[in-house]
Amino acid sequence: MKNNRVSRLAICVVLGSSLTGCTGDAGPAGPAGPAGDAGPAGPPGPSGPPGEAGPPGPPAPAIDASPVSDAPIGKSPAVTIAGATQTAGFGAPVTLVGTASDPDSDVSKLTYKWIQTAGPTATLTGAATASLTFTTQTLAAAKTPVMAQLHFGMLPISPDEAGNYTFELDVTDPEGNLGKATASVRSNPPTTGLQDVPVGIRQFMMGDGGAQTTWNWSLDATAAPGSAAILTGASTQFPSFIPDVVGSYTLTEAVSTKTLTMVAGNWRGEMMTYQTECQTCHNDKIAPDVFTPWSKTNHAIAVQHKLNGTYSDGVTPLTSFPRSCMECHTVGDSPAAVNHGFDDVEKTSGWTMPTKLQPGNWENMVTNYPALADLAGIQCENCHGPQDGAIGHLSTAHTSSGNTTPAKWTRVSFSEGVCASCHQDATHHYKPSQWQTSAHAQRDLVSNATFESRGTTAAHCGRCHSAQGFAAYSAQLAAGDATLLHKPDGTPADEAYLRGLGLQTSTVEAITCAACHDPHDASNPSQLRLGGGLKALPNGLTNIVDAGKGVLCMACHNTRNAEHDDFVAAATDFSGPHTPSQTDMLYGFNAYFMPRLNPSKHLSVTDTCAGCHVAIPTATEKAAGQSDNHNFQTDDTICASCHSASTDGEAFLAAMNAQLGDLGTAIGSKALAILNALYTAGNTLTVRTYRQATDQYSSAAATTPDLLLAAAPTAVVLRSAIHGTTSFTLTLAAPVSVAWTATASAPAVTETLSQLDCQISGITITGQTAPPVPPATTGAPLPAIATNSVVAKASWNLQLLSNDGSRGLHNPSFFQNVVVKTLEALQ
């Protein structure tokens, strides 16, 4: 017990800061002391039931989860261009001044960049400044591609030639904000080249070129009362002036002594009134009714369907038809002049271009803006010039076609320039540009179609070598008449008729748009003058059917000189096949030693000729975004559209050329053998030779061959036809002296030659015997080679194959069989 007590006594208690000592045994318990301080909080009790939801709190701030942008800060500069739309002239300096403002930056810190977006390539000065300068191309440069096709008269200008230069000005501020503006500069509004012109539009003339190198023009405006017109460029080939009032203007070029009369007027528009104003006379009684067929062409509906939201078929949806299209789709739409054109009436009418192309737009124009609707569509005036009814102006539309200097040529032109004034515009209107590189555009054969060069025989050449002649001839063919071009009553064409058609130097045109396409009639596809089939062709082929559009090509691309084969009477002359023999080749027709018809598989091509030569673009045209081909040439791309790409066309052509060479050699050898046999038999050989460079003969008449040959030739080679007659080149054993007969264009000269070119009819014999055909006649000049001899027939066949130009591609099996059969006949 003691130890326990000691242990208890050993306990020290600290109270505050005092130390108590040890105490004795505890006394009895005292009364309870006062309550002590509260102890620390206990652990939390269990959760109570959830309380009611409180009111919604404020929205949380939005969080941008997109990537961080590096776009410029601020607004783009506002940009304008002084002279943004202007007509500057050809070879003229142009200045475009840009002005920019920027709400965020000092304008001195803006940067400028001019970009040419369309038009002829121009040399730009100041392209990195606010002010751009350049010079438009000259008129001569613009017309270079077609210069050889032009002649004295009015000068047409297409939209492409007018030089539609477009520019974009980009202005950038220091923060990278970009502002833009555009400008458009033309050298001149497009013109048709007609002598009937609108008031207020600058017109250009063209003087003779070639040997003429100086010009002296003058303008007489006395028949245009009140005119203050000024002629510019009077000493150049291309003078111009703006006809400023209604009336007649006469231009004279003193060096060539040629004159030109131009009639100026304002536009009239007759879309809604032609039935009453025009068809009173144009009713097929007083004058031809061209209006009824014209009303069914795409020209007549060039606006109405498009405003209503479809293409010309009235079905296919059209999504774009901007106001700028009205320049070609209406009458006289040109801001360059005030002459009652579509734009002039539009300004006063209150009409505005619809913002949406939809049904009812055209009807709205007709109902509420009839004066404007009168000028809508492509009408008579688009292609024939203004018809405002001014004294002396309306009358230019009416003239006799028999007039040798018809006034109608002020309003009628077959020039492609009339069509190109709309249809030659950048990438979507390119057909004239294609045509300009074609053989149809060349004028080297056009002179053969004029009365001045051919007299009445222009009826032969003019039917296919001139636009006017073919337009008349195609009507004959459509009626089943394949004879020479003649008057409507069937009598032979005379000077008055040929000049009235336009087959004279001042008006004749090459094979232009209007030669093949009838602007007044859509009866045939593509408004072609012929379609589908023909009763006859001048090569003797009859009943052509299912040729499609290609039948138009066949009208001229045939041998033309009647049928020559073993199924008709023997030939009585040496006429060769006319040069374009493509139709004969396609049908396998007109060859001696062969069945009468040997048709090509290519006749199954849709539209025959046109299926390959028009419908499919070449590789070059396709690369330019063009969908057809009015150059009419072909390439491997076109062939590959049907044939395997592995087909080696060049190897094929080389093989065919070799066969032609073999045939030519065989013909020459056979002819030489005949001439040698004649000499051996004691005959004398006489030749009338020809000089192609100057178109001269060694004697004045074909019946008087003049060169007596001392010996037979050492070689004979078939050459190209001389004036349509089968011809040879003779190599002589000894040179001879040739005196060329003078002509109107070449003097008489003498030269020594060892080779002579001559028509086969110009090789004659005189002596003891004659060839088997014709019968022997002692002493009389006779053809050394008969018209129905194997040499004459073989020569025809070779020319038929060669003149086709395709080297057998049009009809390979026919080509090869003709060669084989002709070689067999020559043995």
Functional labels for PLM-detected ranges:
Residues 65, 81-85, 119, 191-196, ...:
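Surface-exposed, proline-enriched loop/turn segments that connect beta strands in immunoglobulin-like
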